[in-house]
Amino acid sequence: MGAAGDLPYSVLADFYERIESTSSRLAMTDYLVALFKKTPPEVIDKVVYLTQGQLRPDYEGVELGVAEKLALRALAKASGRHLKDVEDLYKKTGDIGAVAEKLLTAPGGGLLEFFGTPVQKKELTVSQVYSALMKIAQASGEGAQETKVNTLVALLQDAKPKEARYILRTVLGRLRLGIADMTILDALAAAFAGSKAARDVIERAYTKHPDLGYIAKLLATKGLDAVASLKIEVGIPVLPMLAERLSDPAEILEKLGGKCLAEYKYDGERVQAHKSGDKVLLFSRRLENITHHYPDVVEYVKRLKVREAIVEGEIVAYNPDTGEMLPFQELMHRRRKYDVEKAMKEYPVRVYLFDVIYMDGEELIEKPLDQRRLILEKIVPEGDEDILLSTAKVVGDAKDLLHFFEQAISEGCEGVMCKSIGPGSIYQMGARGWLWIKFKRDYRMEMTDTVDLVVVGGFHGRGKRAGTYGALLMAAYDPETDTFKTVCKVGTGFTDEDLAKLPELLDPYKIPHRHPRVFSKIEADVWFVPAVVLEIIGAEITLSPLHTCALNKLEEGAGLAIRFPRFTGRYRFDKKPEQATTESELIEMYKSQKKTALQQS
């Protein structure tokens, strides 16, 4: 065994191998429970981070930053092979982990063995692997590449073949276990608290403080009460509240108790802005730190009339000559790593704020929306043209709501967000519910609204598409079961450039069997960990015996499918797979489409 308070990395590698080989979600959770029970509390945080394929929570932005070429160089050096031989083997297999395992298992698999000297490898621990990976992530400036290579070489020389497989996959961000945060929460609750009530407490804490490593360590060392007492903190993003969708104004008002706050749904990038004095941090919908991309937005947020706050809004690109809002695609020019100042001048933005979650030491999530809106109105500077309140009005009539919706569309918005303003209109962190409802363009016989679906499988291309994917199997997310259910196979809408890019984009997520969280009747040629989200449009939503989305929910033996699906060209890198269109949204779209068709006939 490893040192006291540590865990041999081989134990982790053994569990990863078991998790990787199962297509059962329950088995995956059971393996995690067993792993967490075996892990000393001192390193439970590191085990959780490594299992997520990262070193720190998303919002800290710690990236390993190891390119494929650099990893291959390190492997060649560690195994005593020629770089070309290692590259050729990698081209054949496409899995650097498998290449490492093969090279380090083979006779002469290691530099000292290569020169005929037997070597006694010391046992690697989780702490040693984690520290080495952190050293690689933090290497910068002159000589950083050599530091990364040398650190990785030293790690691989001490690693057993199976350990090397997972170390290299981790380094390249290709662990491929596809374990959802919610599955880790299930396993932590079972391992350390053992009840459904405890699971709810842990999830609630996670929505306020989405750092699973930190929560795991707190739970293992100080217990459930310490986890339950976690508070919202400026600088740590909360999980954003999500919305359902409907397309009938009367039905929306009925769901929201007869009246609602209707608010423009801007075609921009959702942002959670944290202000503490003159310090401002910006986080995306995925909780990534995007402060660097928007130095102008940082300045706008500083103008808020408050010392400390967490506010939510939408960053929207606009035409400085006309003042008109520009579509989301224009905003993507702002996501550059370099020439940020140039992009800022070429693509100016405004921020439209729609919520406040925390202010001057007080959590506001339990306050109803109308009160939060009043607080927000007080802190936004009057007459400011860069940081503004979202355009909104209280409506209690279907005609008024429709008129407001048409006004929003004419001004370049996607539609309208309709929000409950009753006493129970709290801010539900991380939850999708009927307190917020998206009202977007009507789903007539042709599907005029897009959906965001997750790539779960692929089919080999033929002819012109040989060497890439001819079609992709797409799925919607079901939060009830934490699974991805298929809804279509899409092969149209991809440009030649897209097709060339698909293997590069998807192959890092390739796995040898259907992922445990994917529910599919269709057998794909290739399976992927659910990770990549694409925007899809189609002719209509129909019943289908082939797909599993809403299976048996509308008709026995049938699920929902999108007819004539087409990729719009928009990659939703801003969305985690769990933020994709849900099964319940597709059910509502189908019902709405059917109702509209009946009215038209």
Swiss-Prot record:
Family matches, as Pfam families: DNA_ligase_A_C, DNA_ligase_A_M, DNA_ligase_A_N
Enzyme class: ligase
EC number(s) per entry: 6.5.1.1
GO molecular function: ATP binding; DNA binding; DNA ligase (ATP) activity; metal ion binding
Keywords: ATP-binding, Cell cycle, Cell division, DNA damage, DNA recombination, DNA repair, DNA replication, Ligase, Magnesium, Metal-binding, Nucleotide-binding
Binding site for ATP: E263, R270, R285, E314, F354, R432, K438
Residues annotated as the enzyme's active site: K265
Catalysed reactions, as listed in the record: ATP + (deoxyribonucleotide)n-3'-hydroxyl + 5'-phospho-(deoxyribonucleotide)m = (deoxyribonucleotide)n+m + AMP + diphosphate
GO biological process: cell division; DNA biosynthetic process; DNA recombination; DNA repair; lagging strand elongation
Cofactors, names only: Mg(2+)
PANTHER family: DNA LIGASE 1 (PTHR45674:SF4), DNA LIGASE 1/3 FAMILY MEMBER (PTHR45674)
Protein's job: DNA ligase that seals nicks in double-stranded DNA during DNA replication, DNA recombination and DNA repair.
Protein family: Belongs to the ATP-dependent DNA ligase family.
Protein name per its UniProtKB record: DNA ligase 2
Origin organism lineage: Archaea, Thermoproteota, Thermoprotei, Thermofilales, Thermofilaceae
Gene: lig2
